[in-house]
């Protein structure tokens, strides 16, 4: 009788003599002690089990277990959920998009999310204070049923249809006042969580002055309150940071677009830098701050400067901040004028278009405490400030092995693999400023990637669906700096004439 390969390979090949048919719903485990005639056990696959119904009722666009294993972050539709070890989901934020796969990573302090058009960050914290059902009319929240926890003032409010940056500002029992206007006529499940901090503060220009705070402030947190523009965030701690600049003497011989560097003081990566925005007869009359510095000892006023041009004699009077997480001065991204009032610092932030050199990204990873991400449909990629979700404007570079665009990024063995359309290259952290990374000589490869989300870690390396100038859809594993083919002809045959740019891969351990 015929001999069927019930245990063994499973694929369809062009030739029936090479065709192993299909094995459905089993995976094999070989007893390593039985050698050539080893015993093989077949285990049924478990299939899919529904664990968590998410209220957004939309596609799950991405998931990641946060470092430490306490929480999983999942994006469903336009909402960001944090799921605890008991599989209880809590909405903690809202994206500006609702479809398409997202990239998620974290550094143990912040979760970083990219959706192709925007970038977001969530300060890792206990996400839930209360879960309840309620309706909203204008700024009035009416609670119809408390499911778990306790509702209180100074809690951020989340749920389908609730505007971002909404805070419960007053009320008790079943009637509460919220900071944003909404209309939810039918009772829906909502959840609240304590804000990161309640502030007594004022804003003048891009300086936030905090006179009282209930919690710790960090770069990347959203600031909300009466009159505060949506999307206002802390971009830098005030301590050692230049908040404002006055020209003391304008010097001579300067030209528009000259680069100016403040001399003196003790600083970290870089001193404060400027670009000349206006001159009058060679005398500087206007400056644009390009980097606010990070001083441990600030320069003495009037501060001397150097330039890339031919000008001399420009001196500046610098005002630096005092904020280190508590009261003091902080740098924000929006210029406002608001007298002292109650404001709130929130843990979830949609990063503004002014963050970094470009907006958006569709893949992100973490290396040496830098978030690294791409600029979609270009060769560019960027790195955030260390241990921060904020990106300095000049902290970016371009893949340049070939003219093809950068498609995907993965960090492996402390290095950054830039996978393009048909070529790839590897960069490493060398600690330079403003961009910490440099390309490793000899790391270029004539293999790119066919699908940006086909990258998956496997063993001590990673695999992906490759592409080069001769074709695509080989599955390869990175071996050092160069990919090695691991797919069989039969596997590749299944990908022939298929659209694979939207392929997604994942690995698991039995």
Regions found by a protein language model. Give the residues of each.
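A short loop-to-beta-strand structural motif that recurs across blades of beta-propeller domains
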Residues: 79, 120, 167, 233, ...
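N-terminal beta-propeller domains
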Residues: 1-90, 356-426, 432, 503-509
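Beta-sheet-dominated scaffold domains
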Residues: 364, 370, 405-510
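Hydrophobic or amphipathic alpha-helical targeting/insertion segments
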Residues: 101-126, 335-351
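Surface-exposed ligand/attachment interfaces on beta-rich extracellular proteins
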Residues: 54-58, 136-141, 203, 207-212, ...
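Beta-strand initiation motifs
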Residues: 87-90, 284, 324-326, 344-348, ...
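Short glycine/acidic-enriched loop and turn motifs that connect beta-strands
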Residues: 118-119, 378-379, 469-472
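Conserved, function-critical positions that sit in or immediately flank catalytic
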Residues: 152, 195-211, 218-224, 230, ...
């Amino acid at each position: 009788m015929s001999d069927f390969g019930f245990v063994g390979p499973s694929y369809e090949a062009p030739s029936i003599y090479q065709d192993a048919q299909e094995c459905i719903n089993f995976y094999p485990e070989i007893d390593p002690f039985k050698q050539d005639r080893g015993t093989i056990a077949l285990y049924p696959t478990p299939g899919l089990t529904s664990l968590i119904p998410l209220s957004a009722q939309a596609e799950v666009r991405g998931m990641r277990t946060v470092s430490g294993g306490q929480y999983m972050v999942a994006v469903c539709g336009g909402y960001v959920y944090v799921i605890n070890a008991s599989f209880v989901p809590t909405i903690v934020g809202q994206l500006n998009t609702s479809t398409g796969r997202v990239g998620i990573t974290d550094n143990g302090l912040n979760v970083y999310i990219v959706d192709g058009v925007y970038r977001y960050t969530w300060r890792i914290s206990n996400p839930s204070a209360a879960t309840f059902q309620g309706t909203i009319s204008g700024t009035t929240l009416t609670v119809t049923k408390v499911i778990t926890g306790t509702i209180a003032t100074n809690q951020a409010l989340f749920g389908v249809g609730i505007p971002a940056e909404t805070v419960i500002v007053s009320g008790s029992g079943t009637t509460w006042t919220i900071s944003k206007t909404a209309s939810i006529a039918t009772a829906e499940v909502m959840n609240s969580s304590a804000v990161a901090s309640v502030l007594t503060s004022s804003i003048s220009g891009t300086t936030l002055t905090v006179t009282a705070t209930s919690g710790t402030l960090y770069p990347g947190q959203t600031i909300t309150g009466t009159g505060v523009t949506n999307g206002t965030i802390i971009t830098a701690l005030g301590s050692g940071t230049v908040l404002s600049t006055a020209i003391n003497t304008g010097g001579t011989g300067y030209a528009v677009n000259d680069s100016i560097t403040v001399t003196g003081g003790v600083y970290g990566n870089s001193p404060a830098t400027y670009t000349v925005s206006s001159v009058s007869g060679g005398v500087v009359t206007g400056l644009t701050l390009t980097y606010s510095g990070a001083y441990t000892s600030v320069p003495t006023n009037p501060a001397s400067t150097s330039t890339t041009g031919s000008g001399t004699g420009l001196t500046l009077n610098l005002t630096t901040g005092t904020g280190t997480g508590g009261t003091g001065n902080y740098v924000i991204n929006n210029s406002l004028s608001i007298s002292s009032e109650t404001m709130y610092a929130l843990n979830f932030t949609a990063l503004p278009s002014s963050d970094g050199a470009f907006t958006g990204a569709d893949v992100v990873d973490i290396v040496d405490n830098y978030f690294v991400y791409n600029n979609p449909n270009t060769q560019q990629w960027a790195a955030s400030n260390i241990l921060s979700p904020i990106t300095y404007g000049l902290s970016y570079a371009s893949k340049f092995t070939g003219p093809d665009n950068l498609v995907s990024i993965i960090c492996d063995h402390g290095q950054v693999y830039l996978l393009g359309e048909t070529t790839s290259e590897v960069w490493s952290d060398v600690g330079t400023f403003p961009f910490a990374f440099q390309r490793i000589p000899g790391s270029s490869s004539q293999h790119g990637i066919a699908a940006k989300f086909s990258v998956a870690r496997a063993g001590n390396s990673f695999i992906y669906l490759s592409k080069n100038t001769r074709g695509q859809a080989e599955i390869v594993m990175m071996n050092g700096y160069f990919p090695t083919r691991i797919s069989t002809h039969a596997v590749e045959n299944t990908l022939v004439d298929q659209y694979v740019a939207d392929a997604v891969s994942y690995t698991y351990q039995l």
